[in-house]
Amino acid sequence: GPSLLSQSKGVSMSHAGWLVAMFEIAGILGMLFAGWATDKWLKGRAHRTCVFCMAGSALFVFLFWQLPADAPIWLLFATLCAAGFCIYGPQALIGIAAANQATKRAAATANGLTGLFGYASTLVSGVGLGFVAQHYGWNWAYVGIIGMAVVGMLVFLLMWGARADGYEAETE
């Protein structure tokens, strides 16, 4: 959050706090949009929405990374908010996608596992990203963030052909 902004982009801590807050707000709006788009355009296929969100996350983090430290604050704001808009969709939809694919037989287990991995990844990403940034620099931290977004997109792509849920197959 603020450390990344101040150390890699030279943003003051007061501006960094505001940027992080706006990132979170953009994330909430993106999460709501991802849910709506899943229902409206992708016929409940949350995994497809996640593909687009992860691609957007990778793109906007890359663009943010490439901005020079003396870039206008509004440009940092725009790219960071766009990244936040894309990042929160998969976080909200992964539990739904897993529960829908698992059907009622294992929906609670699927949701529990996605929650477990979500919390574990938060712990690992905080420590891991800090380690990479401290020992190898922020450029490698950005590479790691973008790399994980691409890996996430590829994992969701594996489900591209899946139905919105497994309930039809369960009754057949």
Map each language-model feature to its residues.
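Short amphipathic helix-loop junctions that connect adjacent transmembrane helices
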Residues: 1-15
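A late C-terminal transmembrane helix in Major Facilitator Superfamily
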Residues: 31, 104-136
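Helix-to-loop junctions at the C-terminal end of transmembrane segments
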Residues: 31-44, 133-134
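Cytoplasmic membrane-interface "Motif A"-like loop-to-helix N-cap segments
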Residues: 40-54
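Paired intracellular helix-loop junctions of major facilitator superfamily
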Residues: 43, 98-107
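A membrane-interface helix-boundary motif in multi-pass transporters
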Residues: 45-48, 130-148
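C-terminal ends and interior cores of transmembrane alpha-helices
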Residues: 55-69
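Multi-pass alpha-helical transporter architecture, strongest
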Residues: 64-68, 138, 144-172
